Amino acid sequence: MKNLLILLGILLSSPFVVAQHLAINGNVAIADNSPEGTRVVVTKNGNKLDEQVLNKKGHFDLKLAFDADYKISFEKTGYITKIVSINTEVPEESIENNPDFPPVKLIINLLPSVEKIDLSIFDQPIAILTYQAELDDFTFDKSYSDKIKDRIAQTEQAVKKQLAARDAAAIEQERKFTELFNKGLESFGRKAWQAAIDSW
């Protein structure tokens, strides 16, 4: 029994039983709407691993094992899907020396999907997170971000512009409807039946 307890103590103190994972957490935000129902889909080495459905707070919390390639997809019906790529390959000696990497926080903003705008930029990851030996930490691939950030910004600006135009058209349509409705009420009050019908 004593030998068993000693063995158990050795195992518990071993670096191999330390929780070896990278924590990823954050929030999904949607302007003028709730993130409730957003799906956070996790694929590991090309295979679906997990899926979280968010509540109205939009918070997510993930734990990714080391030595794997992940894609985190943020999806909501009617909205543009965004993908983050995370590679958790870390040299074994680095994990033994420092297994507790600080959590990585992500803030994901989703925009409504629109027609007649090329959204293909979002078929690829909006960011890539990898381990950097010189920092002994995880950081985003700056060269990759520099290559796509302008196109992402231009596409999102085009989406927002179309949404603003659509909202303005809806407001104008509502104004015209209200105007015709009021004319109909006025004609109805004067018992000008045909004029009222034409307005409605």
What is the predicted role of each segment?
Residues 23, 170-188:
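Alpha-helical tetratricopeptide repeat
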Residues 47-59:
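Short, acidic Ser/Thr/Gly-rich low-complexity loop/linker segments typical of extracellular
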